Design a protein with these regions (language model features):
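Extracellular glycan-modifying ectodomains
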Residues: 2-355
Length: 355
C-alpha cells in the first residue's frame, strides 16, 4: 500500500514514548504494528489540521478514533496520561457510580459502548491485517475487552458488540458501520437493537406484546457522511454513500414515550437515522429499532455532544424538574462511542443522578 511507509515516517518523527499500560497486556506483533500505524496516522492528521483519514475502498476514519485505539490502557493511573479531558479523565469511577445509583433505585443499567470503526475494519486503514473473507476479524482493541471485564467485576452490565460486529461485519443489508460517517450503519443498529432486546425480554418485569405492533421495511438511501466534510480541501470528495436502513412504523415513525420503562440515553449514536437533518433520516435509528424489537415505545435522552458527562447532566436536570421521572424506569441503556473513553474533552465526572 504505501500507507505503511508513510505511517512509519510519521511515527519516527512523532513517537512520544510507550503507550500507558501497554506492558500489562501482551499484544501480538500484528496488533502492536496496527496500534503504531494508526497512532502515526492520527498524529499526522492532527499536524495537517484534518479530522478524517482516508483508508482503502472508500472507507474514511475519524482521526480521534484512531488516536483512541492507539493509546493503550485508558483507565486507572493511565487515564490522566492519555485522556483529552482536563478533569475526570478516568471513566471507571463515573460508570461504576452511575450504575450504583441506578441500582439503588431498582433500575438496571446496560452499558453499550459502540465499537469504533477501525476496531472492526482494521484492514481498511492498516497494512498490519489481511482479513480472510468469512472469518472473524482479530480483536485489535484488547484494552476495551479488559476494561469491560473490570466493569463487569464491579457489577456493571456491559454489552460488548465487538465480537458480533467483528464476526458479522458484512450483513445482507450492508456493513455494520458507515463508510463515510463516524456512526454505525442501519445494519449495525438493527443488530445492536436485537441484542439489547434479547436482554430486556429476559427480565422478569417484561411482558411481550401478543402481536407485532410496528411495521418494518428496508429501503436504500444516499448520505454524505460527516467524515466527508472533515477531509482536507485538497482531498477529492467521494460520491454519496448508499445505505440500507430499516424504517419502522410505516408512514409514521414510533414516538418516544417519556413514561416508558426503557430509557435510551447517550450521544449521537442514539440519534443518527432517528432525528433527521444532518443525521440523515428519521424512523430508522436505535430508538426506532428498539421499539420495533420490544413492541413498546422507549424513552430517549440523546445529545449531539459527548455521551460521557453531558447526557448525565441532562438526566439530572430532568429529574430536578420531575422528581418522579425515574419512578417507572426499569432499564437505562447508556450508549456512546467507545472513543469517548479518552477523546471526550468533558471527561467523566462523578455526578448525582437526581437532586
Amino acid at each position: 500500500m504505501g500507507r505503511r511507509l508513510a505511517g512509519f515516517l510519521i511515527l519516527g518523527l512523532c513517537l512520544l514514548g510507550l503507550r500507558a499500560g501497554s506492558a500489562e497486556i501482551e499484544l501480538s506483533p500484528s496488533v502492536e504494528l496496527f496500534h503504531e500505524e494508526i497512532g502515526a496516522l492520527a498524529r499526522g492528521a492532527a499536524e495537517s489540521g484534518a479530522s478524517a483519514v482516508a483508508g482503502e475502498d472508500g472507507w474514511l476514519f475519524f482521526a480521534p478514533e484512531l488516536r483512541h485505539l492507539s493509546v493503550g490502557r485508558f483507565w486507572g493511573d493511565a487515564a490522566t496520561e492519555v485522556s483529552r479531558a482536563g478533569q475526570g479523565a478516568d471513566a471507571l469511577p463515573a460508570i461504576v457510580d452511575f450504575n450504583r445509583q441506578l441500582e439503588e433505585r431498582g433500575i438496571h443499567l446496560i452499558l453499550l459502548p459502540v465499537p469504533v470503526k477501525a476496531a472492526v475494519w482494521p484492514d481498511k486503514i492498516s497494512d498490519a491485517f489481511s482479513v480472510e473473507e468469512g472469518k472473524a476479524v482479530p480483536r485489535v482493541d484488547p484494552y476495551h475487552e479488559e476494561f469491560y471485564r473490570v466493569l463487569r467485576e464491579k457489577g456493571v452490565d456491559v454489552l460488548d458488540l465487538s465480537p458480533v460486529f467483528r464476526k458479522q461485519r458484512h450483513t445482507e443489508h450492508g456493513p455494520v458501520h458507515c463508510r463515510q460517517d463516524t456512526h454505525w450503519s442501519g445494519a449495525g443498529i438493527v443488530k445492536a437493537a436485537g441484542m439489547l432486546a434479547d436482554r430486556i425480554r429476559a427480565m422478569d418485569w417484561f411482558a411481550s406484546p401478543e402481536e407485532p405492533r410496528y411495521e418494518r421495511e428496508w429501503d436504500e438511501v444516499e448520505i454524505t457522511g460527516d467524515l466527508v466534510r472533515m477531509l482536507t480541501e485538497e482531498a477529492e470528495a467521494p460520491p454519496p454513500e448508499k445505505l440500507q436502513l430499516r424504517f419502522v412504523g410505516g408512514a409514521e415513525a414510533p414516538e418516544v414515550d417519556e413514561e416508558s420503562p426503557v430509557l435510551l440515553m447517550g450521544d449521537s449514536h442514539c440519534l443518527v437515522f432517528h432525528s433527521g437533518g444532518d443525521l440523515h433520516a428519521t424512523g430508522a435509528g436505535l430508538p426506532d429499532q428498539l421499539t420495533a424489537e420490544l413492541g413498546i415505545p422507549v424513552d430517549l435522552m440523546g445529545t449531539r455532544g459527548s455521551g460521557s458527562t453531558t447526557v448525565r447532566v441532562d438526566l439530572y436536570r430532568r429529574c430536578a424538574r420531575d422528581s418522579d421521572y425515574l419512578a417507572g424506569k426499569k432499564v437505562v441503556i447508556w450508549c456512546f462511542t467507545a472513543r469517548a473513553f479518552t477523546e471526550s474533552t468533558q471527561g467523566w465526572r462523578v455526578l448525582p443522578v437526581s437532586p
